[in-house]
Amino acid sequence: MNFVKTKNMVKRPVKVAIISDVHLGTYGCHAEELNLYLKSIAPELLIINGDFLDIWQLSKSYFPASHTRVLQRVMKMLSNGTKVVYLTGNHDELLRRYSGMELGNLTVEDKLLLDIDGKKHWIFHGDVFDVSMKHSKWLAKLGGQGYDFLILFNRAVNHLLKLMGRERISLSKKVKDSVKGAVKFVSNFEQTAAEIAIDNGYDYVICGHIHEPIMKTITTDKGSVQYLNSGDWVENLTGLEYNDGKWSLIHYHDLNISQNTDEDLNTTPTSIIQLQEQINRHLLTKVA
């Protein structure tokens, strides 16, 4: 593999990288780890597949510097020539009003049909299959807040386990695995996505939303399709990468990544307001 060197930093080249369910603005978001991951790669195309910003949670005024640095990192990637496609999800659905917008290297869409090396890829967040989002949004938001606190508690538990030399655990996964309805929902989600993809002649269907990273073949009586889910940056810290004709599911904890995050960022905004001003300047520069 030929590595890309920029300003004394060696980055790993990636043809396509996909991340989803980052949930910036929540306590559970692993923003520092995501910043490190994004800094380590030089993708031709970065697809952000929904729930990058958790607009539902922004009202609580929690948006630390580590979260603003992730946004700043994406802006830097745009400036360096990476094409970024932002696919909207249910937690950032307010951005759907901008679907179809193209501004420099940034595109906002609700779904993406992509041909990669002759294979048809159908990429979307996945909340379209979630009935609770469409009919009981207040209940979904309440559940999201409970999930946020569960993840925060899980972090404290894993910190103690690390001090004891024990392996980390996922409390939310244990809860989901113990609830038959949750297991059935994941199975139905995957099956529905696969059936629609097969009916439309797609080779791959790629989703996020359910925080279940996986790559597998799903077969029906009408054919088969490759189902991929990029996972999340709350529990699993996972993403998808396409290189050399194949997809890989990457796990942050399996990567050997430098822990120095910010020496290549010119400035670090100290508030979301300062970040908004920086984004506005970036967009004005692109328009000019």
Regions found by a protein language model. Give the residues of each.
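Binuclear metal-dependent phosphoesterase catalytic core
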Residues: 114-117, 218, 223-288
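Active-site-proximal loop/helix segment associated with metal-binding centers of metalloenzymes
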Residues: 124-189
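Residue-level marker for buried hydrophobic side chains located in beta-strands
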Residues: 16-18, 46-48, 122, 206
